Design a protein with these regions (language model features):
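Short, basic/hydrophobic alpha-helical segments
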Residues: 139-157
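Generic structural signal for small/hydrophobic residues in well-ordered secondary structure
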Residues: 14, 32, 82, 118-119, ...
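RNase H-like two-metal-ion nuclease catalytic core shared by retroviral integrases
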Residues: 55, 162-163, 170, 186-210, ...
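C-terminal anion-handling pockets and recognition modules
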Residues: 31, 74-76, 198-260
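Extended, low-complexity cationic-aromatic segments
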Residues: 60-145, 246, 251-260
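A short, amphipathic alpha-helix used for macromolecular contacts
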Residues: 1-28, 72
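RNase H-like polynucleotidyl transferase catalytic core
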Residues: 102-109, 177-197, 214
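Major-groove recognition helix of helix-turn-helix-like DNA-binding domains
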Residues: 27-40
């Protein structure tokens, strides 16, 4: 049918096709929408999925992670690591407001960004967030050292992270190989950011810090961002934890009609 074949962006396009092909004219947009819904159609935005997703690797990772948690000793911990690069720029987001008001956000004078290499413990909400000039092997080691300092009494700290080159760097491997290191790295399957809960923390950060907010300087923006991640999240973890979970799901490209 026309809708399935062309994926029209507007009801106007659908109405024009119906009038041209069937000779029917809908007097109202609401009436046309009701008809489309009765035909099993809906207006929605396609999801974005990575090109090289592997269902079996996702399943194996989730099973391995569940087994680790089930066998986790009291003197062990699990953290998730990632980098994020918030930009000092206005980020408008939909909101409720009085109908008589026309809303606006002042644009910033530039588009500076801050680089954060961070970690979160989902069990406690404790975070480690370091601001760096460049996210690389050196910042990875700094973050791992900060994690070790957070848990001086633990025997083993499991750190889950993505396959960025700097996470695999020789410098990082040499640091891990030194006597007394208590960190074990676990790599999330490639192209699977949905298997790293800290990605959800970044979304929470944007909703609370950047959406519909204006910061006069990048320094103020950095203070607000790092303050949220370092202080607000751990302090309010009981209220925030449901937004940053390890409730993993498998994304199978075969479940989607991939638009080309």
């Amino acid at each position: 049918m026309f809708v399935s074949a062309t994926l029209p962006r507007s009801t106007r396009q659908v109405g024009a096709w119906i009038e041209l092909e069937l000779g029917l004219v809908y007097e109202s947009r609401a009436g046309l929408i009701a008809r489309l819904q009765r035909l099993g159609l809906e207006y929605h935005k396609p999801d974005i999925i990575p090109r090289k997703l592997n269902k079996e690797k996702q399943q194996a990772f989730i099973e391995s992670y569940d087994n680790l948690l089930n066998a986790l000793a009291d003197n062990e911990a699990v953290l998730f690591v990632d980098a994020v690069h918030p930009t000092h720029a206005a980020r408008p987001a939909g909101c409720w407001a009085p109908s008589c008001e026309k809303l606006a956000i002042e644009q910033t004078s530039g588009r500076q960004r801050i680089n954060i290499h961070g970690a979160i413990d989902l069990a406690t909400g404790q975070t480690r967030m370091i601001e760096v000039v460049t996210v690389d092997a050196v910042s990875t080691i700094r973050l791992l050292e900060s994690i070790s300092a957070l848990y001086p009494m633990l025997v083993l700290i499991h750190v889950f992270l993505d396959n960025a080159r700097y996470h695999h760097a020789k410098l990082v491997q040499q640091w891990l190989a030194r006597p007394g290191r208590r960190i074990k790295l676990h790599f999330i399957p490639p192209y699977c950011p949905h298997l790293n809960p800290i990605e959800r923390l970044w979304g929470l950060m944007h909703r609370n810090v950047t959406h519909n907010k204006c910061y006069a300087t990048c320094a103020q923006f950095a203070d607000a961002t790092l303050g949220f991640l370092r202080e607000t999240v751990p302090r309010n973890w009981a209220d925030l934890c449901d937004s940053v979970t390890d409730n993993f799901r498998i994304i199978n490209p075969k479940d989607f009609r991939v638009v080309t």
